[in-house]
Amino acid sequence: VSDYMRFCQMMLNKGKVGNKIIVSKNIVKYMTSNHLGKNINRDTPYYLPGQGYGFGLGFAVRENTGISPWPGSKGEYFWAGYAGTYFWIDPKEELIVVSMTQSVTNRNHFRMLLRNLVYQAIIN
């Protein structure tokens, strides 16, 4: 988990960990930008990562708010494992979450619950 957190912190810090630059800001921006073309059919239940998201380099990237049932901010990005592991980074909220839950049958329930609890706890 600690390596994942350091990676997420590096992404949130636009390529830096502590005082060390690992990748440039431009690389982070490129990785977290949508690279799907306009011809990709996203209006299907089989489209992963889901409505409101595009796809960057290894991440689902939220392009719109109000479309996805998942709480979050425009520009946040995430990815998940089959059995329930999950992380997301929300630059607007300066937020990183890494969850190493293992529950194939309840993974979406736990992911939604975690997101709801985290975003409800944010005080503006």
Please tell me what each predicted stretch does.
Residues V1-N124:
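Catalytic loop of the DD-peptidase/beta-lactamase superfamily, centered on the K-T-G motif
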